[in-house]
A protein has these predicted regions:
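PLP-dependent enzyme catalytic core of the Aspartate aminotransferase-like
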Residues: 10, 21-29, 352-360, 365-403
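N-terminal small-domain helix-loop-helix segment of the aminotransferase-like
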Residues: 29-128, 135
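Short Gly/Ser/Thr- and Asp/Glu-enriched loop/turn motifs at secondary-structure junctions
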Residues: 58, 120, 335-341, 368-372
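PLP-dependent aminotransferase class I/II
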Residues: 73, 251-328, 332-335
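Conserved core of the PLP fold type I
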Residues: 89-220, 231-249, 253
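Conserved PLP-binding catalytic core of the aspartate aminotransferase-like
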Residues: 316-317, 321, 325-360, 377
Length: 403
């Protein structure tokens, strides 16, 4: 039992019942809250692992998980609430298992964003792009199959592969965190992976891929090529989306999310665009009624109000570009960013800097290669707080020369 302050205390019932009698086996067993995970018969490959997740602290400035810092307007929140109230009257029935209305809206949005006509049958949706990517690995990965990613990469790729028993191979990016096209092509030709992960913009570096790089990989990859575009709406002018390659690429899957630019992280909706046959394949592993009626309804309202939901994207892009310039002026190594975050370094002791910022009430992320940190782009006031906290922290731990 947990007290209000989070300290464990034993209830009177537990004090009197340290052991419970198992009537089926005739043996005494420990009370259910008197065991740890080490006492459970979990799979051997899980015993040394920790659950994935970013640190969570209640601080004034949270710039660690790449959320949109701007809330939906009150009028939009009221519209969502009204829609959910109407939907609740039918909550006794299962939702549309294929989320056809939501997928049609997502297809319409992709056409608006990229200029490519996408049909609802070319879109699949899930509880965040994490679920969609997991489903893709369940279909195209698995025991005896392999995947390939460039590093540094989104840590969840390793999780998707681990939980689907897919072997993950990696190859390094360049010193400036760009994709090495020649190395990517030669590695694919040598390993013949079933799945290739590409990320544009890349997390944690923020760097985007040229369409020519994606096309080169599509030309040699024997299996599926996934382009993770979680941050696509933040790309700079002239950076094209991989969605534009879909009409001529049967084995290309482009994943996106409403969690970032759409300021809908709490709604947990992600999606992918691909050939209709790929959608049919994903349906083979989806759980029944995986998207609740409330999720579908709220996300549909968000998409119907896309102009308002995306209204601060240009503001965040401008703040990002100012942050990149400011950090470079201080002497940091900062890759170009097409996302709503910036990676910067290098520090002899990045954890010390991270800790100093946290003491100042600013939470960022220890992400990327050793010596680097990542900051999400917040409001103007939040970024002012970040700059002040970083300058203060640098007095005690200056950056390491990149030479």
């Amino acid at each position: 039992v947990q007290s209000e302050k989070g300290r464990s205390r034993r209830s009177p019932w537990n004090a009197q019942h340290q052991l419970a009698f198992n009537t089926r086996s005739g043996r005494m067993q420990q009370a259910w809250d008197d065991i740890s995970i080490a006492d459970l018969p979990i799979r051997e490959d899980l015993k040394s692992l920790r659950a994935y997740g970013a640190p969570q602290f209640d601080v004034p400035v949270r710039l660690n998980v790449n959320e949109n810092p701007y809330r939906p307007s009150q009028s939009l929140a009221d519209r969502i609430a009204q829609t959910l109230s109407e939907v609740a009257m039918h909550a006794n029935r299962y939702p549309d298992r294929d989320a056809t209305g939501l997928r049609a809206r997502l297809a319409d949005y992709l056409a608006h964003d990229t200029g490519v006509i996408v049909d609802a049958g070319n879109v699949w949706a899930g509880n965040g792009s994490n679920e969609v990517l997991q489903q893709i690995l369940q279909v195209f990965g698995g025991p005896g199959r392999t995947a390939l990613a460039s590093t540094p990469a989104y840590p969840m790729y390793d999780e998707y592969c681990r939980t689907t028993f897919t072997r993950l191979h990696t190859f390094p990016r360049t010193e400036t965190f760009e994709l090495d096209r020649d190395l990517a092509v030669s590695t694919i030709q040598a390993l013949q992976p079933d799945v290739v992960f590409l990320t544009s913009p890349n997390n944690p570096t923020g760097t985007a891929l040229a369409l020519s790089d994606i096309q080169a990989i599509l030309g040699v990859a024997p299996g599926m090529v996934i382009v993770d575009e979680a941050y696509a709406e933040f790309r700079r002018h002239g950076v094209a989306s991989a969605v534009t390659l879909l009409p001529g690429s049967q084995r290309l899957i482009v994943t996106r999310t409403l969690s970032k630019a759409f300021k809908f992280a709490g709604g947990r909706v992600g999606y992918c665009a691909c050939a209709a046959a790929v959608v049919d394949a994903i349906k083979l592993v989806r759980l029944p009624y995986h998207l609740s009626v409330f999720t579908q309804a709220a996300a549909s309202v968000a998409l119907d109000c896309r102009d308002e939901m995306l209204s601060q994207v240009e503001l965040l892009k401008a703040e990002r570009d100012r942050t990149v310039s400011w950090l470079r002026d201080l002497g940091f190594d900062v890759p170009d960013s097409d996302a709503n975050f910036v990676m910067f370094g290098r520090f002899e002791d990045r954890h010390r800097i991270w800790t100093e910022l946290l003491r100042s009430g600013v939470l960022i992320r220890e992400a990327g290669p050793q010596g680097y940190l990542r900051v999400s782009i917040g409001t103007a006031d939040e970024m002012t707080a970040f700059r002040g906290a970083l300058l203060s922290a640098m007095d005690t731990c200056p950056p390491r020369s990149s030479s």
